Amino acid sequence: MKLSTAIQLLLASLVAALQTSQGTAISNKAGTTIEVEILNIEPERIQIRLENGNETWFERDQLSADSQQAISQIETQEQSKFETINQLFGIPLLRDNNLWDDTADKVAERLNWRLESQTATQSSYRVYPHADFRILNTRPYACALYGANEHADLVSIVFANKGDFNFSDTPTEDEIEAMQKAIEHDEDTLVERLTNAFGQPEKQSFGTGRGIKERLQRWDWKGHAFLLASQEDEYVSLRIMSTEAADNKGRSKKLSDAALRKLTIENIITRPNGDVLIGNIPMVNQGPKGYCVPATFERYLRYMQIPADMYLLAMAGQTEIGGGTSLSSIINSVDSYISSQSRTMKQLNEPIKVRTIQKYIDKGLPIIWTMFSSNAYNQYANQRTAERQAITDWRAWKTTTQSNARRTELRKDIMSAHACLIIGYNKDTGEIAVSDSWGPSYSERWICAEQAEQVSQGSIYLISF
């Protein structure tokens, strides 16, 4: 579908605004003139690249009056360039020409994206926008900002996709066709707008492993890479990262086994009441979709310093219409990706007992637990967690816990299959801590190990060194 004439005129003006001029003549107060490329302008100085390729900083007050005026004009023009990006996207993404020196919380504040997770080194902000909201004149279904060491690190925007599309309980052929057309339409619109603004894209591929590898179209602007991914009948997404990260195909710096082992051990928290649990696990809110498996894997992978995105993992898990995913498909696809990061995924068919959980939590390793999350189970978990928060007499709580465990029987509801993380244990009370991908309110709930075994599917998974 062609864009309207008004939008085409807007894009034409954006193209003109985004053009980068090179070869600027500047002179000092002595009258010496040189040809340079202006790289960066600060209030008191400018960064320039000389004809021989060397880069240096020069004090603005040492320039001639004409050059100072010219630099001020360039500064004004440069400031307007980030505004054209904001106008193109339709959101206040930038406050200047560099997103990557902004703190993640400030970016999220101006975007009005809510905090999802905050750890010692990582943060994330996520929003599921209303149906009438638009980015790049296209409806986004999910928007996320990731921070690393306090600074903005990655923006992920998911447009039309199989998991978020509105279907009946039994999808009709017309609904499926509408989804396919929406994915195709969104891709065409995004490609046209980005190409009109930045020129023809480069082709690039990301990822390793069946179902995880993506073919991307890439546009660059002033250290920002705009990466559009589309899978037929699956999804369309746009990621914004630094050009340096994009050149490295989004891979993070690999940690040695020793460095990662030290990091995971440092994440272990021991409380006076005997609780032992793992901190600094990123939270992901899967939203209304049945994305518990990919969301849980994203949390674990990011905890292990491996970049991950639940939408891409969902594609690897052969997402069903409406959002259901296959654990076995995700594991088969993720296994090679994890191996490429020098890590190993293990499946263990062990009962849910405190001594089993303790072996891995004491190494700083969370456990992916497949279970049945019925209404009865969640009522039980919520009630126990609420009661637990008010406890001061832990000896009495131990007695109460043991008595309740013997009297409580939870049934396996096969219609409520779920995956979550086991993140802690209490050896004295016989409890384990679980964490679900439903947002901060579900980051830590405590249940008895006996009841956990009653609703377990029989398998646990972990990623090790």
Residue ranges and their predicted role:
Residues 18-91:
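Compositionally biased alpha-helical segments
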Residues 323-427:
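Predominantly the structural core of cysteine protease catalytic domains
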Residues 79-91, 105-188, 204-263:
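Amphipathic N-proximal alpha-helical interface segments
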Residues 8-17:
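Bacterial N-terminal signal peptides
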Residues 83-101, 107, 216-222, 229-340, ...:
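Active-site-adjacent structural segments surrounding the nucleophilic cysteine of cysteine proteases
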Residues 289-291, 298-299, 318-324, 352-354, ...:
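Solvent-exposed loop/turn segments at secondary-structure junctions
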Residues 220, 238-273, 395-465:
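Noncatalytic regulatory segments and standalone regulatory/sensor domains
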Residues 26-35, 188, 196, 410-421:
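Short coil-to-beta-strand transition motifs
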